[in-house]
């Protein structure tokens, strides 16, 4: 069954609140800080670059100089180097996560909790 709208109780478009959903009002400043810290993005880009460059360069450096044309051993070396880079990334990520947890335990409150929105 349909209900009737009472037009006298409805607000016009100009009378409605400036807030639409979760967006801030026009008079408030929005928080534009990135969700991920810049140091995390830099580490990710560095390890991405290393994941591309190190295995390929290790293959081409070892195929002729170390293994004398045997591409199987050179490919295995490249795979091992890719795993070394991956393990290095995991170790760095775990160390960063542990340092964040220690900061929270000490009462630091994390990296971004000390800041207040203006």
Swiss-Prot record:
Family assignment from sequence similarity: Belongs to the VMA21 family.
Any single Gene Ontology cellular-component annotation: endoplasmic reticulum-Golgi intermediate compartment membrane
Its biological purpose: Required for the assembly of the V0 complex of the vacuolar ATPase (V-ATPase) in the endoplasmic reticulum.
Protein name, per record: Vacuolar ATPase assembly integral membrane protein vma-21
Annotated Pfam families: VMA21 (PF09446)
GO biological process, any: vacuolar proton-transporting V-type ATPase complex assembly
Ranges where the record places region Disordered: 98-118
Main location (coarse class): endoplasmic reticulum
Membrane-spanning segments: 36-56, 74-94
Superkingdom of the source species: Eukaryota
Compartment(s) where it occurs, according to its Swiss-Prot or TrEMBL record: Endoplasmic reticulum membrane; Endoplasmic reticulum-Golgi intermediate compartment membrane; Cytoplasmic vesicle, COPII-coated vesicle membrane
Ranges of Basic and acidic residues composition bias in the record: 102-118
Lumenal topology ranges: 57-73
The species this protein was found in: Neurospora crassa (strain ATCC 24698 / 74-OR23-1A / CBS 708.71 / DSM 1257 / FGSC 987)
Statement: the UniProt record of this protein carries the keyword Nucleus: no
Keywords, ordered alphabetically: Cytoplasmic vesicle, Endoplasmic reticulum, Membrane, Transmembrane, Transmembrane helix
Sequence motif Prevents secretion from ER, location on chain: 115-118
InterPro entries from the UniProt entry: Vma21
UniProt key word Repressor: no
Record topology, Cytoplasmic segments: 1-35, 95-118
Gene responsible for this protein: vma-21
Bilayer topology annotation: Multi-pass membrane protein
Record-linked PANTHER family: VACUOLAR ATPASE ASSEMBLY INTEGRAL MEMBRANE PROTEIN VMA21
